[in-house]
Amino acid sequence: RDVRDHRHLLGLGRVLFDRVEWRAAARPSWIEGLWFGATPESEPTATAAPTGSIAFPAGGFYILRHEQDYLLLNCNPPGTNGVGTHKHNDLLSVELYIDGEDILVDPGCFLYTSDPQAYNRFRSTRAHSTVTVDQAEQNRLIPGKLFCLHPDSRVQVLQWESGGPVERLVAEHDGAARLELAPVL
């Protein structure tokens, strides 16, 4: 199985959360649900999951999709209650997948507390596929607090259109507002 294919989690979620619609999305990996009592006979028939563009505004993720190609735009706020808990400086970053190939990816982070400098590099604005202004972070890092960001920026989705002949997402954030005038990209 491709390491990027996480449909087996939908198979588990289908059983644990009784979400019939996840059964179709999990194919062919629904078999993971066997560990929690699902059987082929007990599984309801589900229609195929929608494959068009979709918005998850509560989580701040917007996906523009055409067939198997997609662009994911990250519009989620910096953390919980204004504290950037376990957050990266990735506002308005994009992930792009075309013709079976990852073009732009989120770098993630493979380490945490063993190397604080490396961890901060991986969660920096420059590590993500988004705009960096004057080499500044979208949200300032807080020294000594690896899992926190200063809540400097707010993100706002201005327009979301999908399902028609034109699909559009217009969003902005104010992470550079605290910087001096005449920024250099």
State each model region's role.
Residues 1-104, 109, 156-160:
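Carbohydrate-active enzyme catalytic cores, enriched for enzymes
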Residues 54-71, 137, 141-185:
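Extended, loop-rich substrate-binding clefts of extracytoplasmic carbohydrate-active enzymes
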Residues 80-84, 116, 184:
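Low-complexity, polar-biased intrinsically disordered regions enriched in Pro/Ser/Thr/Gly
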Residues 5-8, 127, 174:
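Positively charged, low-complexity intrinsically disordered regions
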